Each structure stands twice: as structure tokens, then as C-alpha cells.
Amino acid sequence: MNNSNNSKLTLIPVMITFFTMGFVDLVGAVSNNMQEDFGLSDSAANFFPSLVFFWFLIFSVPTGMLMNKIGRKKTVLISIIITTLAVFMPLFDSFMPTKESQLWLMYVSFSLLGIGNAVMQTSINPLVTMIVKGHLASTLTFGQFVKAIASFIAPLIAAWGATTTAPLLGLSWRILFLLFFLVGMIATLSLAFTHIEEEPGDEKASGFVDCLKMLGSPLILLSFIGIMCHVGIDVGTNAVAPKILLERLGEPGDSLSKFEYATSLYFAFRTLGCFTGSIIMRKLNIRTFFAIIVVMMGLSMIGFVFGTEQWELWAAIALVGYGNSNVFSIVLSQAMLSEPEKKNEVSGLMIMG
């Protein structure tokens, strides 16, 4: 009982860290504000999200190797510090002499945000395996639910800061960075002072090529492809769902903005899926649950292809949102459990996908 209670207490700073992982989604939340403040074109504003996620390709596998050298907890701490620094820097853009220098400060900030998030996503999942001895997929899914909370509130805070008349130290929408900086500090201190029993590091740490060779394992390769499909569905649904609704339900004169609620509907069911999935997977066999959510996504694709009524398209969005919310955690957990001696490297490969 004491070990169970200790594990639950240890998970608290880890879940706060999952919340900081959601900071990366503030890029989309503030891109419109930045476009207005800096007079950016659409293509320039859309470059910021690409800048953030570019670093996943570069840092994911090296982070897996770094964990073998310094340990998982230290690697996660480094990622939180980088992320916290990233959200701290924009608070000082008013001290920069020109708009151009302010913009470069944001470029550096978002680059650090991407680097920190790549390191964090790669290292925090193996860290959880040292705390939770059972129900790994369920715990990782709950962590994704906590992350989704940060993703959900980021645009709300930015919008409030941009429109409120309350005194915000002149920060306007940048108040989001201040609040997230404070949470980042809490995450850093809480994890730093939490004792986590680490597994011994791999004395023969894998190199980059050795990590890529792991794709020779059928399970690892299929998991890698599964993660890529998960990301593709996630990004694709966000981008295309409003356009599909406009095409099928729109009337002459309607604009895309009328159907942007499709993205919110998707995220609502994705968040619901993370929360309920973390509970269901403690009761139901993971393979059975995985089969159910795959069927849900299959039905969703049918709805997107053939649906013409509003309820059919809404159902398709809800099904893919709920189903896709649990794919990442299930696939990643099964991949890491299949190679218990190479969890760090497996995590790096999966995040690179």
C-alpha cells in the first residue's frame, strides 16, 4: 500500500511535466496575435509551427542516447528548463530596440520550445515506466489528457489577454507566457526534489545507426508506422475537417471560418478519449480496446468519404477524435515493453515518427 501511495505521489510532478509538454501548442494559439503585431504574411506566420516541430526530427533519437548517459530524470529536467526558458524569453521582447529584433527573439524562443518539447516527449515516457509497474498505456494516456488541458486553455488565455481591460503589466496576449513560465518553474522544482529510483544505464549505449537498426524488428517497425499514421490523422483532421464541412454543408457565400468549430469538436473528443481511455484500459484488455478504437476510426473514414448530413460528419469527427486519442499511448507502451532493455532508444524512434 505504501509503495502504491508513493508511486501516486511521485506521479504528481510527472503529470505537471506532462502539462508543460502542452506548452508547445501555444504556438498555434498566438500565431494570429504575432501576425497582427509584426505585420507578417500568412506564410510567415505559418512558419512558426513548422519551426517548432522541425526539431523533433533532429533531437528525438539523440535524446534516447542521452538518457543512457545521464539518466531519464535528468534528461526530463533539462527539457523542462529549456521549455521554461523558451516561454520566459518573449516577456522581454519590449526591451528589444526594433520590431525585427523582437521577431528574432520569437524565432529563438520557438526554436527552444521545439527542442525542449522534443527532448521532453522522448524522455518522459521511459521515466513513467520506472514509476508505474502496471497499466503503462493507461498512465501515458492520462498524461496526454493533462497535456491536452494545456493545449486547450492556451488559446483561451491568449484571447483573454488580448481583449481584457485588466492590468497585465502591458503584456496583453503575452500574459500566456508569464503564466506558463510560472508553471514551468513549479514543474522544475517539484521534479527536481522528487526521488525516482532509476534503472542502471546501458554501458554499451546505442549509437544513431544502432537505433535505426531497431526498425528491423517487425513490432518496432509497425509501431513506428503506427505513430506516423497517428500524427498524420491528427494533423490532417485539424486541417481538413473544416474544409470538408464547408464543401458538404456550406451555402453560397459561406467562409471557412463558419466551420472552424470542427477543430474544437475534434479536440473535445480527443480530450474526452484521453480521460476515459486512461480509465477503460485499467479494466479492459488493451488489444481489445485497440481493436475498438481502430474500428471507430475506420467508421470515421467512411463518414468523411460518404457523409452528406451534418450529423454524419459530426459523428465522423467525434469518432476519429476519440479513437486517435489513445493510439499514441498504446503503440508507444507496447513498443517499449517489447524492448525492455532499449526503452530509451525505442522512445526516441517513436517520437521521431
Question: Across the structure, where does each feature detected by a protein language model lie?
Answer:
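Extracytoplasmic gate region of multi-pass secondary transporters
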Residues: 27-29, 216-264, 271
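Central cavity-lining transmembrane alpha-helices of secondary-active solute carriers
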Residues: 47-65, 264-276
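C-terminal ends and interior cores of transmembrane alpha-helices
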Residues: 81-99, 296-308
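Cytoplasmic helix-loop-helix junction between adjacent transmembrane helices
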Residues: 103, 109-145
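Intracellular juxtamembrane helix-capping segments at the cytosolic ends
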Residues: 119-133, 325-340
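Helix-loop-helix hairpin linking two adjacent transmembrane segments in secondary transporters
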Residues: 134, 139-196
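C-terminal transmembrane helical hairpin of 12-TM major facilitator-type secondary transporters
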Residues: 284-331
